[in-house]
């Protein structure tokens, strides 16, 4: 039978088929997307304009992506079975010491959110902005003797990226085992030659991808946003920086770049290594070498590495923000480059204001993603009307992800206050319970607030109607950004 592609019936059948596929996809979204906002944000366009939304849904949708989540959980189980013979997690004493500490109660439910326990006797150091961060990371790698683990969302083949590449090549030539993991989507601009040079020099480097095989190119929504460096099991780093010149303030439109990292030593480094091992095992089906020191210090601060991701049994990242806000009795200060809270987190912020808590959120004054910036602006205006003090950082782009609760609890890591970090990305955050370290974080944030402009009720009223329309459209699609 010959199909006449110029027949009006052909186009009628084609449109009917597209609308039928749109209905099927909308039903799939309703059954698989975890949140009502996200389900509606997908289902309505799929029903009414499927010819514009079917392909984006194939690429960005299918939130629960059950096949992937099942495979990821299975890989994690296999990895932990493989680790069983390593006498890993020998932190019983540090975990018991943490639980017996008076500071432990300040975390409330937070220690139960993650797979890894809160541990005592750690040392932490605040690293403010790119120079301090990469000076410390490079100095630590320079002294490496056994194993270096490096994981970033973005690696650029620029001045900083090349400096890291040369340093890792030099250490590999000295006999150090070097492992590098980067996200395939975040590092999409990284040329294959960058990785090949490292491989030729003895460095093991792999891209983190959601799935193996050709279909992976159509599934870009799950991204590994973690930033982890561990050297010899003795010194580690996590925070907001990626590897690129812009993180040193070399991007004219976004400079100076404001970001925060933290340097860590102590038993919690075992947790950072375990998080890296899970991602490395998923990418390679092999375990990297994991190192434990012979002894730990007898004193230090309470820390917990909170790793989160779409394969978790619960929405770990959003629950962390909820519990951090709910637990605040005096203040909760949050800095994030994106401010797209879901209904629960927004309600928690509103309730904290009603309890008399000093609630402040610091966001950028310059956009790096215009749609996300527009959505963030509308949420910021609504937060101001709810009594939250919202600030825009003025000197340059703000990329740090920091939470300060009352006088003891701080969190520094890779997680943003948005739907992507809540439900789509793999993230890692370091929770620290220590008044001295919290004082340092407070001083750092106080300086940031002094360089910020507070958003006022007048700002919300002076916005042009076209801008308001754009913000509302951006907010409508924010659950799928």
UniProtKB/Swiss-Prot annotation:
An MF annotation (GO) of this entry: cardiolipin synthase activity
Membrane topology per record: Multi-pass membrane protein
GO cellular component terms given for this protein: plasma membrane
All residue ranges annotated as the PLD phosphodiesterase domain in the record: 220-247, 394-421
Domain of life: Bacteria
Membrane-crossing segments per the record: 10-30, 40-60
Chief location category: membrane
Name of this protein: Cardiolipin synthase A
Organism: Pseudomonas putida (strain ATCC 47054 / DSM 6125 / CFBP 8728 / NCIMB 11950 / KT2440)
